[in-house]
Amino acid sequence: MARRTPSQLNMLLAVDKPVGCTSHDVVSQCRRALHERRVGHAGTLDPMASGVMVMGVGQATRLLGMLTLDTKSYVADISFGVETNTDDAEGEAVRTVAVASELRDPAYAREQLAAMLGPQMQVPPAFSAISVNGVRAYKSAREGNAVDLPPRPVEVYAADLIAVSGEGDTCVWTVAFSVSKGTYIRALARDLGRACDSAAHISALRRTASGVVSIGACHAVEELSPEFAAGFALDPIAALGATRVDLPGDLADDLLCGRRIPVERALASFDSSKAPFALVLDGGLKALARIEGGRFVMEHVFPQAIGGVR
């Protein structure tokens, strides 16, 4: 079988991950859809979760660790009455508590959610991808081993009640969260249940934003193709939180060779106090640089320009 010709695509994309597949599945699907082996992502989502996944394609995979995606937003369904070993609906019940009537009171729900705001130390779920002595925690947990993960600093910026639903033995709070990177919404649900003298787990989860990338910028994998993907590209400079600097085309060879370039070669004024600097030639991102001694010093050079610059 003949090999596919590489797509030559170099860009960031936002994909709306569906429920039921892993983050690696999404990477594999994008590789097939775009005919491009070099595809990666900027942060995982659990199989039961859906929503924003930021993908790097081609040269843009080098940007994934630099993106300013520190704030995450989610809409979560928190089901009371049962705590599971995974802190979500896919796990086994480890504790069951009768649903108290106060849990159905929106005022009580808002009071409890308000108490969750701010910086805190969070114990991650035992079923997580955190490595312990070189082994993923979820692998140890699946084998029946005790997993003792140390608490980590996280912050909850917002926890807004959308609705209280359910009747009989069920009670569900639908909550919009805004949290720091590394916060486990599953763990928030677990701790919320305990704070309410109850038990709780996540029954549905959707990531609605990752940094500056919102769900409205996302596309289904089925929409992707080499011919049309360029129209879906994210602005890499906005995603990096970088300062744009346009340079004349005659500096292409200097950039490619990593030579220092005088700041005065910039085609327009820019804020020299806000690094990093995204160097743009002919509408494409060619390098990231800092300034030393009145010259741009290259930190990352992209032989194939990264598209999507606006």
What are these regions (language model features)?
Residues 1-180, 185, 190-217:
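Catalytic cores of RNA-modifying enzymes
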